[in-house]
Structures are given as C-alpha cells and as structure tokens.
Amino acid sequence: MSIDILFITYNRPDYTKLSLKRLLDTCDDTMRVWVWHNGTDQKTLDVVQSFRDHPNFFEFYHSIENKKLNEPTNWLWKNAPGDFLGKVDDDCLMPSGWANVLREAHVDVPQFGVIGCWHYFEEDIIPEYANKRIVRYNGQHQLLQNCWIGGSGYLMKRQCVKDMGLLQANRNFTNYCIRLAAKGWVNGWYYPFIYQDHMDDPRSPNTGLKTDEDLKKHLPLTAKNTGSYSLTDWLDFLHKDALVLQSANLDPKYYLGLRAKIRKFRERIFPLKSSIIKESEKI
C-alpha cells in the first residue's frame, strides 16, 4: 500500500538541506515525496533542486506567492494516488522507519484516521494526564488519543479525504482532524512515541534558534500567532501546548456546533470562571 508525503519549503535552506534529505532517505519504493515551494528564496530553491534526482522525490511545484499550508495540502490530496497521505515540515527530522510503523498500524486498525509522530520532549509529558488516554487497539498498537494532532509527521488514510473532502479556506488542519473525530475516526500519536526532531524547538540539538535574535529572524508561524517573541516565551508555549494535547477534551462535539459557541461565549463573559471550569474538565 503506497504513501504520498507532502513537504513544504519556504525560506529555511539550512533546515531544508537536513530535513528533506532525511525524509527522502526514510522512504522506501512504496513512498513518494511531493515538494511544494512557497516564495522565491533562491538558496532554499537550490537546496530543493539538488535533491530532484533522488528516487523518492516524486513531484515539485513552485508557487511564487506564499500559499502557506491549505493550498499545498489540497494539491497533494487532490493529485496523489496513494492509500495513505502524510506531511512533514521543513523544520522536522524524521526517524528511520516512521512511515512503515504508522502504515502498519493503519492497516491493522481500520478506525485509525490521523496518527503521527511526537515532537515534544520527555519533560513535556505529564503521566497523570497522558496515561489516561493511551489506548491499545487490536492487542498490538497503542495510541495517545486526541481529537487532533500536529501537521508534521502524520499519516492519514485516503478514506478520510473521501469522507471529509479537502481543506476549506477558513479551516485549518486542527479543525479538519476534529471533524474527522466527530465522524468516528480515531486520531492520536503512536505509542511508545515515534520521536521526530522539531528543530524549531530551542531544545533540539539541531536548532537554529539559539538566541532571541535568531527567533525574531526566523520566527515560526506558531510563535508569531501566539506572540512568542523570546526564547523563554516560545519554550513556555511549547511546554503548555504539550500539556493541552495531553489534557484536552476527547469529545469532538465539545469543539463543534452550538456547544462550542456557548463555551466561547462563556469564556468571553466569565473568563475567570471559565479557566476554573477548564481545569475541572481535563481528562
């Protein structure tokens, strides 16, 4: 059963040189890597072109305009023929065999929807939260369940796209995963964890973010969206993000429809009470 993997590049030539080579080298002859380049950074383009002859480099698309994530993702989903669809970010180094493990789990467990690799650190794992949501399926595959997972190092059944369609312009991958969960698909991180090295985590041995100035120069999109403009703030966000993923409500209806609207209204009107309720709702 074949796998198609999206790899998006932008303006990080040093990261791309490491991450694209690693991704290509982790693939076998049943896997195809589709590279989409956003923008006109020539150094990054040169790095991408240097890998064009690799046997696992399947397709390349260059968008002069930065189309970010949704359009490249839909490009893969519309055109790729594989049984499984994945994505790896240019700031992530994948471990050997990662896609094979996830594919085997998908084949053995029909209800798995989006499953993936973990990129947080040991210090980010809170056993009293995580252990409650690690579930074994078919006697052999374990998953740390959540309604959504991150957008790098995942593998998704093609049937998910048949069920849900493409990413809509006003919705992100997190929302897509939640809606899949609402349809009965099971999402989460394979356990024991398959670790991908997130180089934009300042704790990574391969990070390019060693000072606050490095962070400002190469500000990750998530850091920008969360107002994390110093290494201290960025590390604090990453740790809290891992906590959220281990404690978030497992009922997808909590995030959708009328219940979600009521919850957002309640949080806006009664912020202190809402924070207390959130703590009590942790699973």
Locations of the language-model features?
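Glycine-rich, basic loop-to-helix element that forms the pyrophosphate-binding segment
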Residues: 63-80
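A conserved acidic beta->alpha catalytic loop
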Residues: 36-47
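A recurrent flexible, glycine/aromatic-enriched loop bordering the glycosyltransferase active site
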Residues: 70, 121-122, 136-156
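N-proximal low-complexity "stem/linker" segments adjacent to membrane-targeting elements
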Residues: 1-21
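C-terminal catalytic/acceptor-binding lobe
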Residues: 167-283
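Short beta-strand-to-loop acidic/aromatic patch adjacent to the donor-nucleotide binding site
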Residues: 82-93
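Conserved donor NDP-sugar-binding/catalytic core segment of glycosyltransferases
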Residues: 97-129
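Short, acidic, metal-binding catalytic loop of nucleotide-sugar glycosyltransferases
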Residues: 21-30
